[in-house]
């Protein structure tokens, strides 16, 4: 369980200190960081974290001029707090030396979950979905037209009148409402 990554180690130490602080101050009200009575758990944890003592790794310089340094590399984000300008320059020199010695640049890894791929997939799906109801509707229309064509001309007119009367009868229901 021992991790050699300094960022992971720093995070674990900070979580341990925060846990100890919360346990120590859970029975008594805090005077260092007053918290309102109606504050939710997240706000209380944020207030406790603000009042927690700062834990430093051995070998870290305490410099008031240090700023946060963020590195984006290989799909990961690394954030270094209190980075001095000298340390940032050294990191940039190291990165440029590592980049220059490689020869031909490597192709970035293919990302499976790209928004463009999802957009194209959705477009294909919707195209298939649109085609399905249209073909289903057209097949019903063709069948109905074929059934009408099979009837003799005299029966077609009679069937049309019957269909009209059926719709009128369904809509009015006159005999039920005449009371």
Curated annotation (Swiss-Prot):
Q: Does the keyword Transcription apply?
A: yes
Read off the domain note. The jas domain (115-140) is required for interaction with COI1.
Official protein name in the record: Protein TIFY 11a
Tell me which UniProt keywords the record has, alphabetically: Jasmonic acid signaling pathway, Nucleus, Stress response, Transcription, Transcription regulation, Ubl conjugation
PANTHER family per UniProt: PROTEIN TIFY 11A, PROTEIN TIFY 4A-RELATED-RELATED
Q: What cellular component terms from Gene Ontology apply here?
A: nucleus
Question: Anything else of interest in the record?
Answer: Plants over-expressing TIFY11A/JAZ9 display increased tolerance to salt and dehydration stresses. Plants silencing TIFY11A/JAZ9 exhibit decreased tolerance to salt stress. Plants over-expressing TIFY11A/JAZ9 display decreased tolerance to cold stress.
Q: Which InterPro entries match?
A: CCT_CS (IPR018467), TIFY/JAZ (IPR040390), Tify_dom (IPR010399)
Say which species the protein is native to. Oryza sativa subsp. japonica
Its biological purpose is as follows: Repressor of jasmonate (JA) responses. Forms a ternary complex with RSS3 and BHLH94 to negatively regulate JA-responsive genes. Acts as a positive regulator of tolerance to salt stress. Involved in salt tolerance by modulating potassium homeostasis through JA signaling and regulation of the expression of potassium ion transporter genes. Acts as a transcriptional regulator targeted by the SCF(COI1) E3 ubiquitin ligase complexes in the JA signaling pathway, and interacts with BHLH062 that may directly regulate the ion transporter genes.
* Subcellular localization(s) per the UniProt record: Nucleus
């Amino acid at each position: 369980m021992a991790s050699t990554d300094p960022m992971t180690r720093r995070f674990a130490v900070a979580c341990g200190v925060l846990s100890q602080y919360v346990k120590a101050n859970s029975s008594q009200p805090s005077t260092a960081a007053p918290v309102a009575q109606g504050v939710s758990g997240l706000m209380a944890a944020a207030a406790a974290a603000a009042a927690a003592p700062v834990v430093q790794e051995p070998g870290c310089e305490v410099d008031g001029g240090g700023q946060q340094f963020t590195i984006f590399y290989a799909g990961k984000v690394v954030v270094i707090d209190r980075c001095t300008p000298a340390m940032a320059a050294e990191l940039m020199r190291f990165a440029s030396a590592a980049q220059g010695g490689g020869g031909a640049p490597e192709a970035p890894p293919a990302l499976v979950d790209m928004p463009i791929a999802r957009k194209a997939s959705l477009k294909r799906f919707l195209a298939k979905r649109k085609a399905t109801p249209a073909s289903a509707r057209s097949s019903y229309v063709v069948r109905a037209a074929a059934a009408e064509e099979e009837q003799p001309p005299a029966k077609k007119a009679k069937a049309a009148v019957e269909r009209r009367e059926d719709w009128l009868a369904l809509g009015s229901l006159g005999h039920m409402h005449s009371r």
